[in-house]
């Protein structure tokens, strides 16, 4: 039995290690790809963070548009071909990771702050004695980048991804 992240499980599966995932459901909704930045530093570098998060959102959009393109990019020599040593594991890992990146059903924006997930983390931390109290998510979460992270032309990104796939896929 094993409790851990999707990437840990994928790495074990690639090497033929069969495990039973006992990760608690509440831990599976824990925020993924979290970035912690000092508030002043964040605002001093707002444009840099916006550009990074927009690029990240564009990549997630390509996966939402056509996950096969992300798979092909990942398999390419300048991607992460080692993650595809076992094709079935690579596909399972990609599908699982994609679910963590995509917006909630019915939403079209990427990178939204999942306050409910952070409340779940706080509850789990209280349960194991790591913290004694509830914390106000407004003290450590911000929505300031959600607009700029989604400020891109989705059709243009899709066209560029299709062009890459036609040339390289």
Question: Predicted segments — roles?
Answer:
Residues 34, 40-41, 109, 134, ...:
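Residue-level preference for alpha-helix termini and adjacent loops
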Residues 1-83:
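Pocket-lining segment of extracytoplasmic ligand-binding domains
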Residues 119-169:
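Conserved C-terminal helix/tail region of periplasmic/extracytoplasmic solute-binding proteins
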Residues 45-132:
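Secondary-structure end/capping motifs
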Residues 5, 24, 82, 104, ...:
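Serine/threonine-rich low-complexity intrinsically disordered regions
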């Amino acid at each position: 039995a094993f409790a851990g992240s999707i990437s840990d499980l994928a790495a074990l599966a690639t090497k033929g290690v069969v495990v039973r995932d006992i990760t608690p459901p509440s831990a599976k909704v824990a925020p993924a790809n979290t970035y912690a930045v000092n508030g002043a530093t964040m605002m001093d570098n707002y444009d840099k963070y916006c550009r990074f998060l927009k690029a990240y959102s564009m990549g997630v959009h390509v996966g939402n548009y056509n996950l096969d393109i992300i798979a092909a990019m990942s398999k390419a020599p300048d991607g992460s071909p080692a993650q595809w040593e076992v094709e079935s594991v690579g596909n399972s890992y990609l599908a699982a990771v994609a679910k963590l990146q995509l917006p909630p059903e019915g939403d079209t924006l990427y990178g939204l702050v999942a306050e409910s997930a952070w409340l779940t983390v706080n509850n789990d931390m209280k349960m194991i004695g790591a913290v004694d109290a509830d914390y106000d998510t407004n003290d450590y979460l911000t929505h300031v980048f959600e607009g700029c992270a989604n400020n891109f032309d989705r059709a243009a990104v899709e066209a560029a991804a299709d062009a890459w796939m036609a040339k390289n896929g």
